[in-house]
Swiss-Prot record:
The gene is rbsA. SUPFAM superfamilies: P-loop containing nucleoside triphosphate hydrolases. Its main location: membrane. It catalyses: D-ribose(out) + ATP + H2O = D-ribose(in) + ADP + phosphate + H(+). It comes from Escherichia coli (strain UTI89 / UPEC). This is Ribose import ATP-binding protein RbsA.
Length: 501
């Protein structure tokens, strides 16, 4: 079968880093090509070379059989290559229709915007995706999952021959994911080629026909998905066997460290639970259940309206994140790019940002040598892949950014570490490293709250699990009691079992 798009022998280097070396990718009509690899394997760089954001150092790009070079995203888009980025590219203050047709609005014969036609066309695109809202709604009023669907509608509006989807289901619910897969199958039947970049093995085996594997910037293999197993695909990605996906540390927790009684706040209603020293408490639930809101109330990022929190026997009041940090509670956000990291700053500056008091002299000046030593130690301990600590953190892969975010939290020497979706957007190899770090923190007596939408992760890593449903606690289970079935039953409100200590 002749490929719609072919990239062969692609090289791309940056100062101190060879991002791509002999990389290759084929996209076929009517087929979904998965592009997989650990974070830092070169997937994003390849997409930027393809769409003309980066100029390739070597190699060829064939589009519809002809050698081509795109000068930027506009030229690749006009040629018929659409891309849906992992980071949303929408304007919250505009309506859905205005976002979809931004820069190419429908105009009438008087040169004025034809709003009626524009909204009608946008509504048709939303209907194709089986969405329940109209296109006159403001994008800022939508959930992250619904905003992602608007991004997909925007690309569909270009009638692209090849559509690149970068982690498209990262923020989608199961229902939204099913809608997306239905649309992908429709696009396949129309002869379009799709590049599907994802870390989610289940999705790759469900929706993709072929898979291309990258490792360390190099092309490893192109295979039909049907010829592979999850294990064999992961082994190709990481270059080694993954014996134990979730390395649980079997060590009994200590005394109660954190006690939460009848906590209320925005999206949180009357929640009570305990957390022990050296314990990993998993927090499960569906999107919108109030898990993140609970953590933010606890940490001080959202206001507490009632309830009590005690830490090591002393009552704690957190009116701001600064109060949370001062009391030894650290929150690592699920949205590391918005809440967690300053992308234009260096690895060193990001890592030490909240711990500068430990590196400050009485007069306020910094002990730079101490700061550099601490950052260097964490880079080594966490195996952060970066050319130097002065590298801008925005240039690191997702897994390495997440390690820096966690290291920054630990630099403040916390008693309670809240990890909200710590492995979201992180590849299988980096996930294992993060799990091993979590176990190390547990062994050191740190109390950890692990919020995750991935049930196997919660089940595999936690000593005890609480489940949220519509702002309430709907279940509490020991490691032995917990199964995917009971967690899901509690998450949808069908089961209510809370064992308070």
């Amino acid at each position: 079968m002749e490929a719609l798009l072919q990239l062969k022998g692609i090289d791309k280097a940056f100062p101190g880093v060879k991002a791509l070396s002999g990389a290759a990718l084929n996209v076929y009509p009517g087929r979904v090509m998965a592009l997989v690899g650990e974070n830092g394997a070169g997937k994003s760089t390849m997409m930027k070379v393809l769409t003309g954001i980066y100029t390739r150092d070597a190699g060829t790009l064939l589009w519809l059989g002809k050698e081509t070079t795109f000068t930027g995203p506009k030229s690749s888009q006009e040629a018929g290559i659409g891309i849906i980025h992992q980071e949303l590219n929408l304007i919250p203050q505009l309506t859905i229709a205005e976002n979809i047709f931004l820069g190419r609005e429908f105009v009438n014969r008087f040169g004025k915007i034809d709003w009626k036609t524009m909204y009608a066309e946008a509504d048709k695109l939303l209907a194709k995706l089986n969405l329940r809202f109209k296109s006159d709604k403001l994008v800022g009023d939508l959930s992250i999952g619904d905003q992602q669907m608007v991004e997909i509608a925007k690309v569909l509006s270009f009638e692209s021959k090849v559509i690149i989807m970068d982690e498209p289901t990262d923020a989608l619910t199961d229902t939204e994911t099913e809608s997306l897969f239905r649309v992908i199958r429709e696009l396949k039947s129309q002869g379009r080629g799709i590049v599907y970049i994802s870390h989610r093995m289940k999705e790759i085996f469900e929706i993709c026909d072929d898979v291309t594997v990258f490792r360390d910037g190099q092309f490893i293999a192109e295979r039909e998905v049907a010829s592979l197993t999850e294990d064999s695909l992961i082994e190709m990605m990481v270059g080694r066997k993954l014996e134990d996906q979730y390395p649980h540390l079997n060590k009994a927790p200590g005394d109660i460290r954190l006690k939460v009684d009848n906590l209320c706040g925005p999206g949180v209603n009357d929640v009570s639970f305990t957390l022990r020293k050296g314990e990993i408490l998993g927090v499960s639930g569906l999107m919108g259940a109030g898990r993140t809101e609970l953590m933010k109330v606890l940490y001080g990022a959202l206001p507490r309206t009632s309830g009590y929190v005690t830490l090591d026997g002393h009552e704690v009041v957190t009116r701001s994140p600064q109060d949370g940090l001062a009391n030894g509670i650290v929150y690592i956000s699920e949205d590391r790019k918005r809440d967690g990291l300053v992308l234009g700053m260096s690895v060193k500056e990001n890592m030490s940002l909240t711990a500068l008091r430990y590196f400050s002299r009485a007069g306020g000046s910094l002990k730079h040598a101490d700061e550099q030593q601490a950052v260097s130690d964490f880079i080594r301990l966490f195996n952060v892949k970066t050319p130097s600590m002065e590298q801008a953190i925005g240039l690191l892969s997702g897994g390495n950014q997440q390690k820096v975010a966690i290291a920054r939290g630990l630099m403040t020497r916390p008693k309670v570490l809240i990890l909200d979706e710590p492995t979201r957007g992180v590849d299988v190899g980096a996930k294992k490293e993060i799990y091993q770090l979590i176990n190390q923190f547990k062994a050191d007596g740190l109390s950890i709250i692990l919020v995750s939408s991935e049930m196997p992760e919660v089940l595999g890593m936690s000593d005890r699990i609480i489940v949220m449903h519509e702002g309430h606690l709907s279940g509490e289970f020991t490691r032995e009691q917990a199964t995917q079935e009971v967690l899901m039953a509690a998450a949808v409100g069908k089961l209510n079992r809370v064992n308070q200590e």
